[in-house]
Amino acid sequence: MDDVVEVDAPAEVVWSVLTDFDRYGDWNPFISRCRADLTVGAPIDMRVEQLAPRPIRMREWIRSVTAGREFSYSMKPIPLGALRSKRSHTLTPLAGDRTRYESHFELDGWLAPLVGLLFGRGFKKGFPGMTTAVEREAERRHAR
C-alpha cells in the first residue's frame, strides 16, 4: 500500500512532524500514541486506531534510519513465513520548500490474506488518513 503527497513545507518540517512521536495524538488519526528513539533495532510502540472497535497496541522494530530522509520499521516475523510486515516513511526535498512524502506498507506471508480480511478496511482508511494528516500538520507548522 503506497501513498505519495507533495507537501508545501521543507523536508526538515515534514521530518519533524514524522519524528515528533509525543505529539502524534494531536494530529494523527491512525496512530494516537507512539514511542520510539529511532535507533536501528529499537522498539517502536504504537497505539493504532481504526483497525478494530478498540485501539490496538503494537510493538514493531526500527529497521532503518537516515536522519531527515527516511525511517522504516517492521513486526517480528511470525515463524515459517506466516506473516511479516514493513512500514516506511521517505522524504524527498523538492524545489520551492516543498517535499515529496512517500508512505509505504507491505504485508507478506501465508497469513497476510487473513489479516487483510480482518483489518483491510482499517488499513485502507488509516494509512491514507495518516498521509493526509502529515501533509496538513507539516503545512500548518510551516505557516507559523
Task: Provide a role label for each language-model segment.
Residues R35-L80, G129-R144:
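Glycine-rich portal/gate segments that line the openings of hydrophobic small-molecule binding cavities
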Residues P10, T39, A67-G68, L94-R98:
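Short strand-connecting beta-turns/loops that link adjacent beta-strands
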